[in-house]
Amino acid sequence: MTPSLIHPGTRRHVTIVSASVGAGHDGAASELARRLGEAGFTVDRHDFLDLLPASLGRLLRQTYALQLRAAPESWERLLIALDQHRRLAAAVRALSGLAARRLARSAAGSDVVVSTYPLASQALGRLRRRGALRVPVVTYLTDMSVHPLWIAERADAHLALHPTAAAQARRLGAADVRVCAPAVRPGFRPASSVLERRLARLHFGLPDDDRLALVVAGAWGSGDVAATVRDVAASRLATPVVVCGRNTALREALARSGVGVTLGWVEDMPALMRACDLVVQNAGGLSSLEALASGLPVISYRCLPGHGRTNAAALEEAGWAPWARRPDELPEALFAALTAPRAMGSSGAADPAAIVAALATGRDSAATGRPASMELSEMVEASQ
């Protein structure tokens, strides 16, 4: 339990705005909220899509899911168009402004507001420009690649997961970019012993002696997951264990195929990762960071158009995960991962929750380069 950062008799209030599109934005928000709550802050969380008028938020969520399922290349084309055409980008920023009034009410009384979703950052930046929000706005960049929509004018700070992402954010004009450690739940850690890994395999009914490749595709089971499972199995280097998330149709189809081990929605992902030897992913989001925190090598393969491919490129540039771009590259990547696995380890970057806490309490020194745990403990000592 983290000691309180708040002096007795004071109240510090943090508002976090995410979005229920997949699980990555909400996952980061949830972990930030947990850390800040344990440090003594009052934390409110809001779904940006719920702040949009009428049923617009639900429509956006459904449209995005449909794009990824039925026409994934259209999502990539849209992201490229938003990058290249100012009028289209301006229209999307204006769309985010539809939530501004409710967002201003939701953030009232906060000492700092954190966004883990691009459109929320745009709406908060708009409020800052108009003087309707007078406290710092912090954007936590959930992806390793940074699209221009992430960067909002008048956002006070941007937290990037790696110098690669930080450099992209700076090129796009982001203010006060800082590198932080990923906001990953502490349960994601390497197995402490062979026995712990075997018990995890027993819990999920997994083969005890096989090399296991965990195939992840987000909460929606998006992408060409079936082909990935077949390709991993065909390599004869590992048995695929696929997590289908909430995609019931995918789970049923893979179960009928009889290839590998098929799972649906898994609550205890930390234990499942400790049961496996490597992770094959297609989006480059939170699951990749959780795998690295668990000491597992990660391979990007059959990546989703758009953010999946740009994240894969950034992960590869950072040295965190190779990208097998073609089926004939997968066996070599699997062999390398299984014979010389590399864990991400401690990055030495600041705890993002500590940065937010410092901004909320007026103790911000923009200090980086120290282990995240030391950063938080030093703030605790200073507050006491």
Regions found by a protein language model. Give the residues of each.
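Short N-terminal targeting/anchoring amphipathic segment
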Residues: 100-118
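Active-site-proximal region of nucleotide-activated glycan assembly enzymes
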Residues: 131-191
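Donor-nucleotide binding loops and adjacent catalytic segments primarily
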Residues: 194-202, 206-276
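A donor-sugar binding/catalytic signature common to diverse glycosyltransferases
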Residues: 269-310
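C-terminal "capping" alpha-helix adjacent to the active site of nucleotide-linked donor transferases
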Residues: 316-320, 325-341
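C-terminal alpha-helical cap of glycosyltransferases
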Residues: 345-384
